């Protein structure tokens, strides 16, 4: 067994890289001193691993360890069984089958079944054993019951049984021997340190015995077996049990054994038994060598018995774990100080391992030794008994030196292979460590597997070559058998791989057996067994998991075939993890496979064989490793002497044992060398140590060569294997730790002696069933199977990745290989190869440092194992306490102060339709274009025409006929596009089913270009069909489209959906757009001339006669070019259509735009490199489909538009902003170019699509006007001529050559990385031959930007026109809206069209607003007087029938509350609540007050002076609307809303001036009358013009109610008339009491207003917005056209606000404003109480108290709209002039200053003007001149005049 362990250790090293192994081993020595005491070190080759295994030191008392361990083992076993439950349950069946398999033992199929039965039976045995005390008899009786029956049968026909077992064992050995030997060792130690070791050792012994019936018999003489039997009184039982155990192992009894094979041994007993074992081991091994094959067969029986006894003993602990009595030597029997420390450590480990023979271990088991060794070790020891002298023959100093040379030279190979090339001794040591530690064994197997995989391609031949002709013969036989087996395998390919591996494994087993037995007959028997086992394995694989196990088996078999070529460690581990994960996750049909997979995790090969037999697999792999090693040992006659090192170490357990291998005669040594070489090549790490000891330098060199070859194969294979085998996405370390935790839980009482640093790492990877030192010591890690990533329930999505990760980690446990494996997850094979190559040249010292770091990392990971592992995909683990933490008991943490926002819980109120907008993509009704938006019905033609008429009457001068047909057409086109996209996606879905992987790749690369034509052709057909279906639907239902498909999938922004296609579609700025269009037209003409000139020039080159004409034309062109400026700067506010105008004109004229916007990297170098070539010529994209598609410059993604990334959903994306390759964006467009062009322009969808649209439009009942239809047809033709409609065929000749145009967006926005951006623009301007357009929102940019360019200024379009445009957009979306909402919205957004449209889309797609029943308001005046006004204005005859229709037609409800939603008022007031009525209502409740404060705070946070702007409507004073004036046509006049917004026309001024005329009226009748009349006009104009600092939102429903109330009062007041009022006021100042009372009433109201305005002015001056203190934006300077350029004030101010936040500032302002307003309102209300008394006295002051408001002002809910009158501009100019003077330039708050200063200045100017008129004869000194207030005289005159 020690030999097996050594082999496992040797196998493990190969994955470890030489440099890494050396440091690990050196550490081992250093650690060994401590490790000898601390079995921990044995477990973990690296200190880090050890620490990982048992981070906290265990009690020094071994009894505590073991006593804890056995129960822990039972628990662990139970836990492990639970973890491995699926696999172990199979083993239980396997145990049951074990009995059957004995019968079936002769039959391969029966063996397979038996293996399964043995597994299940073993599981039962394990359970029983776990329950059973240390007494093996009871467990043995149970095991023996099933196993003994098998064994009895086998013993009855020992030879037959042996042969069958041999066949089975050989097969298992072939399949498993290399991996399984390691696996069984690993499994026994890792999974069930006691049970597993006994079981695995027992299995291996039995398997070897069965395989070679002489295998064990040869290696284990009868005497040895007898000694074992003698040692263990229960040996006979054990033999029976072992035989049955072997059968059960073959039948997957290993799992059960693993679970139950742990023995508790006292320290004293351990020492005593160790001495006895040492004495016994040597003779036993010697006897085993001497014993003939027959004797061997007997011995095999006895050996099986003894092993079974041991296994039973260990089965009590755990079947697989064999406790070995280690001999205590004060000094390792063989240590050479001359040899480097690394090799000395390895050699010492080998010596120690050799000293502790399997016999000794078995004896120790009898004595309950503290050390657990696997069967293979026992078997090896039994197989070869030798003197301690044999150790020297194993590795001489010269050999060591040679090895060191080889080790140093092939560092890269060593790194890759885990120091396969490094000394055999290292490998042996590693193997020993692995062997000692079940995990090590697994890691060895993994190493072997990795090595085998690496060599697998070359591996079989190499392996055969290495092993020799005999091995070749065996391999051939095995191959033949394997081929047969493969044929039998359910999956031939997988079975074939598995068989190949099995062949190699069998070959190795045969070698080992041959080495052990040295008999051809036994070899033949082994071949037969191996072939049988292979067949069984393959069959079992098929049975258990045809896919997974077969894969595993193939992997394992490959590993076996060429331990050289076998699957890399990763593969093995992958296989294990895969099988386990499949078993656990998928609950593979065979719990056996699961248990096997668990074992496989311990042994990758075992997992492969698991399909056959977990026991057999383990035995095979173990036998491979152990048999080769054992053969080497037997030939060498080397014994393992166990040496107890007592050097105290704090961090390690008190007992540490070193196993020294005692090599025997050189003949056997040579044989072993050959075998070891072969095994080294094949097994990689398993036999590497034995080989190292026995191999000569030649062997080493050969091994190095093989390793190098194998590494290359391994690199390629490991990756593939990882992908195939490992289902879990996890790093090797992660896998290992959870597995180790599992192991520790299952096998707590097993002590694993680990001498090889790399061995432990590999076992960790394999460790699902391997025991870790924690398990051995009884240290139970609190990781349940659930926590183990391998067992985690993982979504199938992540299985492949996890499998890969798990595969990579396997090699990572060798220090170097660990790093490599960890990186393999991230890097591809080439990266790993490069890294290995680079690492190969590193000095040993550096390699050691790297290994130390890796070890420290392992230690850290081990320490952190107590915490729940972080898994990205992890389901809630009910067993984990972290998911059930109690809330903190601290009241400070549990009792938080509840924030009382005083917001009404709307859910408790009656839910109004639209109050909660839930987006459901699947709604029942598919009739609406906005199906998911409350399923709005498609408006019929009658309804649409009525609503259009309503819009027309709200804004009669807006050309609805110009815009609405185009908008409606775009909506229909969008629906067609969406249906096409849907069909395209359906097509893609169909294709994706056939080409899933390829489709995924293409999706990432945004679709291959090759597929586009086919896709488009298919899509065209589908689209045509769908469009026909749509038209049919429309005909039948009157609905445009069934939006059920489109619902919820609209990904196109409305700014792109309704983007203007021609210059005529733009709103406002007609002159600027016309100028831009003419400029581009000139450039287009010039480009065409140049093109013609070039064509002529080419012809003229042929005909030189025309050269004179050419020169002349060229000169004229040059003159024209010099006259035409190539750059235009467009300035204007944001969102007014600058970029839209550029695109519309370019679309119309056929320009192709290269856009560089702020989202691109715009450094000058990048721009020049990307665009310079394109700027040197006019034409781009000679062939036309894509000629006008814009190109977005983006340094990051040249192939994509920077503005949008195609979304995976079914979406209709912007035709302009989305990369053309996306079918969504391209829609009807054809193959799009690979450039960064996005079809910004609205491209009509191909001729067929146009026909469809035409049909839709014709079928659309909503459009019946012949004009509208004409408009549509005209638009179509226009689009066709303008290349808006890009037919797939050819474009017009003029469109084929697209003139390029460079558009630089937001040139005033420059980031740090945009170095040289402006200089690059200037370079373009100077050198380009194409037009360049710059856009900016900074009005001062033209002043600071040097260059020759023309400036075109865009201004804010008419507010009412934009509102009507938005209404039409809503109408196309089947929403009826109120113009007041949009006027308020645009006022709040300062008429930003883009922002408003986007918000409108959000609002409508969110379900719209509150639906209100509203009559059709065909009016030009106030909505209150709808019918009257309509009759007054004399509606056309057209409208009357419509009005009559209105009564018949069910008008849709009106969606209101758009602006309120924007301002968040719906969160404060329920939709049914009226804001204005709430404010007019006297607030008495605390809740109402909180609501009022919150409302005002919300407005303050949005810089909206709500109360100030809406005093007319919220004060209890009457309001009257002034009739329409000639200025109402304002829409024709464009006003800068933002500037208007900045103009502060204060109500205070209005009130103060109103007060003045009232006082004056008392003096002069006529003048008073005039003033009063002017006063009303004054207020009208004042209210016409908004206070620009005020962007106010509107409450639609409430204002209507209020205005209706106030309207009655106004109408009454008006009925009385201003004239009679004026006549009354004309008389002398009131002397009567009635007159005095009325004057007092008016004066009191004015005083209250003035007080309120004074308070607000004070607040404005005192409490400035904190946010504006630290930044200076254009808002502060726009009134003077001044601005701080971007970037100068972007940094945060160092000043602190002392915690004064904008929130607190807004709350303070809101509170003061609320208090002041409440005082004012209550005072006015109180004063109005005297109104009736005044009326009784005969005087009605109502007219004096009335607010007169313009109709436009009345249209704005609660914000003053930007006035469209010239007076507003005059006022703004006056304000700018006054406050730009030096004296007033630095006045603090602009708003407060305007309110405070302007009224006084106006009064002074008026007075001074009168004085000047009176002093006409002499010079007049103006007051302003006297105080040196330098205001221009023109401004003074303007101030002196009445308000403009």
Swiss-Prot record:
Record's GO cellular component terms: Elg1 RFC-like complex; nucleus
InterPro entries per record: AAA+_ATPase (IPR003593), ATPase_AAA_core (IPR003959), P-loop_NTPase (IPR027417)
Annotated effect of mutating residue 1169 to A: No effect on the RAD9A interaction after MMS exposure. Resists to DNA damage after MMS exposure
A Gene Ontology biological process term: cell population proliferation
Pfam families (UniProt xref): AAA (PF00004)
Subcellular location(s) per record: Nucleus
Region described as Interaction with RAD51 and RFC5: spans on this chain: 1630-1719
Region (Interaction with WDR48): 368-384
Region (Disordered): 178-204, 477-499, 580-623, 658-700, 987-1047, 1092-1118, 1203-1235, 1272-1292, 1591-1635
Protein's recorded name: ATPase family AAA domain-containing protein 5
Source species: Homo sapiens
Name of the gene encoding the protein in the UniProt record: ATAD5
